[in-house]
Every structure is written in structure tokens, then in C-alpha cells.
């Protein structure tokens, strides 16, 4: 199969590009996914790259499924070992193989927003904090921000020791993390952070 058929000059150039990083800037509907899928097929068929050495990450499940389908149309059954998915699904795949190194088992549970709110509600009750002052949504937003900036509960508590409210938020964060760990659970931020 000719993996360059139907591509314009710039697309062909991207598909056959040598080694190293390549940044493609193009607007919606310009053929970026087409270039990526043809590049994957080209690397496997023409350059001998093993499928499990290719990682293609998208933002949405829809885009990931579309990419898998397109690569499948080009390569047939050679896509089983390809890593095509969203950031989170790729992280789950990596963690299922390696999370034991972090003290979790591979059958960890992923907490959705409802589960997270339930855990925070338990934490607020356990720490005897006022549920009107410490709202689940606000606490979860803070925990998410802290995780995304790689601030641990202890660091946050130490940084905010003189601030009663923030110190309590830090205590909530610490208890939240403990409860997730005790239940072999991860939230969506953990999927990225722990990978």
C-alpha cells in the first residue's frame, strides 16, 4: 500500500520526516489526523518500527477511536500493540502494569467525581469540620490544583500552618489521599500524577 497516496506535499513531508520531534501546526479539518495515521503506518511498514514503540495521544475518546480505526484500515491487524488513546487511558494502561511499585495493586479503582465528593464528605465529618465552611466542590478543586502542581498534603499543611482554614484543607487533603490509598483508589489527577 502506498502510504503517501492522496497526501499533499506538506503532508507527505510530515509522514516521511526523519527522526526526532516534529511540530505540526494546522487548523481544523486540514488533515492532521490523516497525517498522523499515515505516519504511524509508514513508520511500521517502511521504517520497521515495532508497533509497541509508537505512542499516539489525543484529548478525547472519540479522536482516539477515530485514529485507531484509521490506522486499522491502513494496517489491518497490526494495531494490537500500538499505544493509541487519551492521556488518561494511556496512563491507566501504564499504571495497570507498574503501579505495584507505588504500593497499589493493578486492579485499582478509578474514583469519579461522585466517589470523590463522597470521600471528601467522609473526611469533613471525620475531622469534625463545618460542612458549610468546607464545601466538597471547593475542597476537591483545591486538591486537584495541588496535585496538578505536585504539592503534597504535608507540604501544603507546612506552607499554611498559620492559616487555620488552609491548614484544615491540607488535613482534608491528607485524609482524602489516605482513604483513596486504603481503598486502592485513584482519582483522575492521580492517573497523570502517578504515571
Language model features with spans:
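Pre-Walker A adenine-sensing motif
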Residues: 5-16
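Glycine-rich phosphate-binding loop at the start of an alpha helix
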Residues: 8, 37, 189
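Active-site alpha-helix of zinc metalloproteases
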Residues: 5, 34, 57
Amino acid at each position: 500500500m502506498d502510504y503517501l497516496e492522496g497526501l499533499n506535499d506538506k503532508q507527505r513531508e510530515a509522514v516521511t520526516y526523519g527522526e526526532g520531534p516534529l511540530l505540526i501546526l494546522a487548523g481544523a479539518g486540514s488533515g492532521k489526523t490523516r497525517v498522523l495515521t499515515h505516519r504511524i503506518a509508514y513508520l511500521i511498514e517502511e521504517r520497521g518500527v515495532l508497533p509497541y514503540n509508537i505512542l499516539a495521544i489525543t484529548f478525547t475518546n472519540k479522536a482516539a477511536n477515530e485514529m485507531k480505526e484509521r490506522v486499522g484500515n491502513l494496517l489491518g491487524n497490526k494495531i494490537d500493540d500500538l499505544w493509541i488513546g487519551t492521556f488518561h487511558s494511556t496512563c491507566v494502561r501504564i499504571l495497570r502494569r507498574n503501579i505495584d511499585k507505588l504500593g497499589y495493586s493493578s486492579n485499582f479503582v478509578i474514583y469519579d467525581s461522585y466517589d470523590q465528593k463522597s470521600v471528601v464528605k467522609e473526611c469533613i465529618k471525620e475531622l469534625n469540620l463545618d460542612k458549610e465552611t468546607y464545601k466538597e466542590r471547593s475542597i476537591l478543586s483545591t486538591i486537584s490544583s495541588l496535585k496538578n502542581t505536585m504539592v503534597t498534603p504535608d507540604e501544603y499543611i507546612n506552607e499554611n500552618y498559620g492559616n487555620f482554614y488552609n491548614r484544615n484543607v491540607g488535613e482534608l487533603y491528607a485524609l482524602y489521599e489516605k482513604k483513596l490509598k486504603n481503598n486502592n483508589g485513584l482519582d483522575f489527577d492521580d492517573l497523570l500524577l502517578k504515571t
